[in-house]
């Protein structure tokens, strides 16, 4: 009886376990499945997976829907590929999906594409894919039947998933399907928010089709892969993968494994990344599918580029899944993972499945949340039809239509301009506009807005232009707004509002009723307040005079960078009649000054200057609109006839050129050199990517990189700077300007300016920073002048980084970062602009090198390789050796 009850209990437990697994396999509560291009409000359950797909109409506000060419609508084609939504209008079009679980969770996000000649043009497109405001990947379609899948694992920082398609003028972007799957929080744990799928293979898979849901509870797609001279093993019993660290690879995948036929061979997976700086995580899934006899052993080690990555050998467990993975991301020009048989093993290595992901580091900050909430409220209130989806200000090149933003350092972008003219707006001016506190320009003209002009518009202190023409506004103009207009602090346009009263009597009449109620207590209050104000004023006056009568020391604190105009007499006073010269350049002399107890640098235009007023004006106009911690701040300027001056923040430690030339006795350490280079690179990156249109500095050199008392570097001297076209097709063929040695040879030849001209110059500066040598030096053997790029190129062939690094550093430098920075510098200084990296890439490399130097990386010289020259991806291929 006891035996019978125990047997019944076992049977019940088995049935219950199977039931739980079936229920779990059917659970789609963490799924969002969208078929792009099917009619609005339609849905269906996929015949193969039973996943419910819905129309994309509720998740996107733009685009047109199409069916693919009937020629490609075969019975075997997944239903999601039979329709598409294309986006022929606008540079950026976004899907906005709100998963039920919201932010803080980890999701697998997948986009799928099949062209199918839906437009009958026979031209497969090429476009970019963004997740929110950061680039995810590029989508290249080879032909009508090519299926492209892009997958990313991402932890949400907001409640919304924004998937955006960006037009590159290489065909119309489109999308076939968008799928979002909730993952366990303990799955794919890394310090990074996003991992892009590189490869996911079912090794030794017996089927011809990929494995996915319901076999995989997370609906990962496993591609079967088999190799010649490899044995495939198939488990006779089911592999347990449910307790596998949360990964839970599909049981069908884990039931098969592959191993070399040659018992002495290893398994090798290797690939050469397109970019050697890309970082990868690799997850290898193992299960012994054959019960081994007692005299057989399967044991192996896992090596990366011939170095062990696990401290001990590994033996897969019979019918149980284990996952081995790297704790830290790996990178390099070539990555090779080897499963190496140990001496005591009688059997070769075995593997069931492998996943490889590339780290996607999101460098762009999202738009200020208050601004986002405000503009979304405005969109909802007025039903704005402008395809306002995704981040309003990011990416930098693709802000929302009719929105302009400011981009300062690493801070969140801010909305500074909103144009809603002729947008069919009705009702009153919404209070949400008051939360756009950095707004400079607001255009609400030619709508049907009613009611009064709200008082809060007068409190937007940054607002310099307000256009309310052509509406149905009524009542009086707010007093503050009228006062600001009278003081020419704001350009106020209100024509075309017949019921709007603009006379002074309106203001008096409007305020009279309010004031009469409070007039008696107000008079009594005013007397008391005036007395208090007078007392405070006298106290502050005393304090100010007392401070001035003290030591007279000059503060080293932060400056007030509010730009203002100064009279020439004030400039004379600031410089104490031009007492102390700090330096001299083509513009004129630079003098030391004191302004409001702060040190400043005052650049005076020489009347004999060859640069003159044009460069003066260019620098003033540029510095008035750009703000970044690595660009010198303009405090003010003077222009009285031929007398012109620029007042900057004071940079106590001179220029980078002073240190490299030996003019200063202090020798910059290796870490200080890297940090100064990073500072300068960040300043240039802001000019190139944070300004719209991009700005080219045109004269990047050590003398134009200033250093403050904290050894923080800032780019200076913008008199030669120019804006260039956003699309990169700049046709500026003005006279070539710059400094010999740093001047881009391609720009000098073609006279066509682009950001890559700055990158060339910065590469030369980097070589000077690394070597401590001048840009042009005379050869000891031929007595000819040799450029630093030629000298370094020659020394690279020796394979000894010590021959390149500044000898004043001795052995006090990190060889790994020295190699990296030298390679980056040489790539920047390539004679062809096409081979030069972007400043964003340079900044990323420098950040990594700074981190390495601070962590005390090894100082030994590495072998001579040039990862920057690796420009292909050979895929990831297993080999038996």
Swiss-Prot record:
Extracellular topology ranges: 26-518
Topological relation to the membrane, as annotated: Single-pass type I membrane protein
UniProt-recorded Gene Ontology molecular function terms: ATP binding; protein serine kinase activity; protein serine/threonine kinase activity
InterPro entries: Kinase-like_dom_sf, Leu-rich_rpt, LRR_dom_sf, Malectin-like_Carb-bd_dom, Prot_kinase_dom, Protein_kinase_ATP_BS, Ser-Thr/Tyr_kinase_cat_dom
Pfam families, per the entry: LRR_8 (PF13855), Malectin_like (PF12819), PK_Tyr_Ser-Thr (PF07714)
Signal peptide: 1-25
Catalytic activity: L-seryl-[protein] + ATP = O-phospho-L-seryl-[protein] + ADP + H(+); L-threonyl-[protein] + ATP = O-phospho-L-threonyl-[protein] + ADP + H(+)
Enzyme Commission code: 2.7.11.1
Glycosylated residues, chain numbering: 143, 234, 295, 310, 404, 419, 435, 446, 462
Subcellular location field: Cell membrane
Record PROSITE patterns: PROTEIN_KINASE_ATP (PS00107), PROTEIN_KINASE_DOM (PS50011)
Gene3D superfamilies hit by this protein: Phosphorylase Kinase, domain 1 (3.30.200.20), Ribonuclease Inhibitor (3.80.10.10), Transferase(Phosphotransferase) domain 1 (1.10.510.10)
Entry GO CC: plasma membrane
Cytoplasmic compartment residues: 540-881
Modified residues (Phosphothreonine): 734, 739
Residues where ATP binds: 582-590, 603
Keywords on record: ATP-binding, Cell membrane, Glycoprotein, Kinase, Leucine-rich repeat, Membrane, Nucleotide-binding, Phosphoprotein, Receptor, Repeat, Serine/threonine-protein kinase, Signal, Transferase, Transmembrane, Transmembrane helix
Chain intervals for the UniProt region annotation (Disordered): 851-881
The LRR repeat ranges on this chain: 438-460, 462-483
TM spans (from-to): 519-539
Residue positions where Phosphotyrosine is found in the record: 648, 747
Keyword Nuclease: no
Family in the record: Belongs to the protein kinase superfamily. Ser/Thr protein kinase family.
Protein name: Putative leucine-rich repeat receptor-like protein kinase At2g19210
